[in-house]
């Protein structure tokens, strides 16, 4: 692809994403499906703006590569060892059972047995990019089902190696393509990568970090990820597996969070590009000519994988309320099918339109997953949020809660426990099914679902409640929920969690004056203890803490970004210069004795 064509393609990708994803979010179908539909629109079977799909699809796999690196950073080797049973037990069972059933059905559909085996293995794989994205959106990452889902996906990535090696054997060309010496060299190179990464990566990043130049650290991170991907690709292995291993090797290093921050922006953009590329690859011509075959294939594929996954989740001991989510999030075909089927086609295992039919089936199955997850969410919401059959209800089951708490993470738990301890009637909204089940055991009134849905808020008693406490992890969800409450439930007293000054400014601009910055109060308390440790009288340190809180809050309100950036920067610099002077002057002039009951936020 020429430079000008690449630039044009980049502009088209960005335009498609900007146009389609917000529309998909407004329709409630999720960002992933929005990307897929955008790809169909600009691809060769849509408006035809881009025709070189294969090259773009290969490039867009970098999104999956970056995603797997970040996942590796979150899993240290000891944690990976703890998951061995689910990886090699449930993961292997899912691939083998699904592949066997699907291969048998393909043989009934007049596929050669060799092609059916390859087709069954390819269809048994799930989309790592889509599944992980949806698990993050649905809050499944910390749940049992999310951990099991990740284990299955990891085994599927490991299964890439033997699956690709199996293709020439099935094609009858093993003598020409299977070289034991080359295999041994690949294993040796892989071992060198593991050992070298284990002992060299930390010293290298320590040397780079010592330079103090953030851009160089980001460049080094990109170099590591891309080098690991290219190295594994040269060995004929999965690029995503290589970067995952690199992430695991750095998971226990002191640079883990900095590495994650450096990669995260690239990961999100390239993942979007990957989904757009998958949408572009959908062959609508094959779909039109074999509509019934493709439709039946998609339904059968999703049903078989869901049934297999559901049964395995049951055997593994996953809660019944989480099994459907686990089964549906992995029910689609995956990106690995494109690689495996292309390799099989080069070995002439497929006849006629068989490869095209399989790829269309995989692509459409990926489009069904967001819709399937949305439907299951509604079903779970009706099931979990329905009226209790218990006649004996604890006092927290009052139909008219005083407070609605959105989110039951570490921040929300403290608030909910404090309110419960003071006999306040509360209702909790949470989208982690495991947390919902646990909270109900302890007498909390909990509603499962997305709190940004008006109907869920109504069901939770928003029309009768006095206050709502928003403790969402994502700032976007917080601001969306604030706007929703102001529009539909203007009587609610809104209190919110702010992750930092930027979100605090956004809340102030939205009219929310009661908020708490999650690290501010704890930092002030530690600062007070530091002053005491340096010899300051405890009472004086307490007064200093309260004065600083008031001054900081005043500056926060005065620096709401209503003017240009230069004006705001100028005011911030001026405020910093005057902070010490103001602090000392007001400490001296303060006549009122402040104590711990004064409220400044």
From Swiss-Prot:
Location in or out of the cell: Cell inner membrane
PROSITE patterns tied to this protein: RCK_N
Question: Which UniProt key words apply to this protein?
Answer: Antiport, Cell inner membrane, Cell membrane, Ion transport, Membrane, Potassium, Potassium transport, Transmembrane, Transmembrane helix, Transport
SUPFAM superfamilies, per database record: NAD(P)-binding Rossmann-fold domains
Pfam families recorded for this chain?
Na_H_Exchanger, TrkA_N
| InterPro entries xrefs | Cation/H_exchanger_TM, K/H_exchanger, K_H_efflux_KefB, K_uptake_TrkA, Na+/solute_symporter_sf, NAD(P)-bd_dom_sf, RCK_N
**Where, by residue number, does the polypeptide cross the bilayer?**
4-24, 29-49, 55-75, 87-107, 111-131, 152-172, 177-197, 207-227, 230-250, 262-282, 284-304, 324-344, 356-376
Q: How does it sit in the membrane?
A: Multi-pass membrane protein
Q: Which GO terms describe its molecular function?
A: glutathione-regulated potassium exporter activity
- Where in the numbering of this chain does the RCK N-terminal domain appear? 400-519
Q: Which domain of life is it from?
A: Bacteria
**Some GO term, biological process aspect, for this entry: which one?**
proton transmembrane transport
GO cellular component, alphabetical, reads: plasma membrane
Its predominant location is: membrane
The role this protein plays is: Pore-forming subunit of a potassium efflux system that confers protection against electrophiles. Catalyzes K(+)/H(+) antiport.
Q: How does it assemble?
A: Interacts with the regulatory subunit KefG.
> What family does the Swiss-Prot or TrEMBL record give for this protein?
Belongs to the monovalent cation:proton antiporter 2 (CPA2) transporter (TC 2.A.37) family. KefB subfamily.
* Record protein name field: Glutathione-regulated potassium-efflux system protein KefB
Native source species: Salmonella schwarzengrund (strain CVM19633)
